[in-house]
Structure formats: C-alpha cells, structure tokens
Amino acid sequence: MYTSKQPFLKSKQPFSKSKQTFNKSKQPFRKSKQTFRKFKQPFRKSKQPFRRRPRIGPGDRIDYRNMSLINRFISEQGKILSRRINRLTLKQQRLITLAIKQARILSFLPFRNYENEKQFQAQSISIITGSRPRKNRHIPQLTQKYNSNRNLRNNNQNLRNNNRNLSSDC
C-alpha cells in the first residue's frame, strides 16, 4: 500500500536566536545548488578488440616431451622467458618452467643455445670495439683540484705510516 508523505510538523517551541549559537568556522562550506548537472559515467575498457589468443591452447599438454610448445617459451640464448613476456598465468608459467628444466636434465633441450649465443656475443663485441671518440686532453679545474687533494691525502697517509714504522723500531 502506498503512503503519502507526511506533512511537515511545526515545533511547538518558538524559535529564538539567543539560545542557538552560530559558529561559521565549524560549518562546512557548501556550494550553491547548480542548475545543470553532469552525470559522470565510469570509463569502461572494451575488451573485445584487444583480446589476445592465449599462447597455450586448452588441448595443449604442458609436458617435457611437447617440444613444439616448450620452444615457444625459450629465448634465442636458451633462457626461460619471463611471465610478462609469455603472458602466462602463474600456474602455467610454473608448469612450463618445470617442463623446460626436466627436458634439459633428460637432454631433450640444451642448457644454452651456443650457436645463437656466439652470434649475440659477436654483435655485442662489435658494438663495444667500434670507433670511439678521442678523449679530450684538457683537464677541467675541478678534476685537477680533486687529484691534488687525493695526492695530499696519499702523502699524509705515507707520512703516518713512516712515523708508525719509526716508532715501532725503537
């Protein structure tokens, strides 16, 4: 049954300003009512276009003998790829890691892929031994000051050591 709103009942006591104290500092600041309101809707990401197919299908068995599956999760150097790169769940990553380790122990997989590792090392060496810019022979004042302070410290250290040696000889 629908009940209508009850009418506002006036209090029997008369309103007196002297009894109530009005303290502005304790009152929270209220903005005036706005005539136009915007209703904000929460931002929802649509998962449809960004949906990626999982790397492990529902029928794939994570086993040390399933080499085609295991090879997807190993880098060119033979290292196990991280979860972030693989996009696997924790449980899947754990099972893959165990399968890779078991395959290595049973010599289905090498511990390292030496062919690709040699290529990788050759590239890194060529980058390091490439043409280097000439060092500037001009030494800034700060470096000279630092070197002179270091020389003074070394000299003082040597003097202290000599004094100790002389006192221990006596």
Swiss-Prot record:
Residues 1-61, 149-170 are annotated as: Disordered. GO terms for biological process: translation. Keywords: Chloroplast, Plastid, Repeat, Ribonucleoprotein, Ribosomal protein, RNA-binding, rRNA-binding. It is found in: Plastid, Chloroplast. GO terms for molecular function: small ribosomal subunit rRNA binding; structural constituent of ribosome. Residues 4-52 are annotated as: 7 X 7 AA tandem repeats. Transmembrane segments: none annotated. Pfam families: Ribosomal_S18. It comes from the Eukaryota. Residues 27-55 have a biased composition (Basic residues). PROSITE patterns: RIBOSOMAL_S18. Its main location: plastid. One of its GO terms (cellular component) is chloroplast. Residues 13-26 have a biased composition (Polar residues). Sequence repeats lie at residues 4-10, 11-17, 18-24, 25-31, 32-38, 39-45, 46-52. Part of the 30S ribosomal subunit. Belongs to the bacterial ribosomal protein bS18 family. This is Small ribosomal subunit protein bS18c.
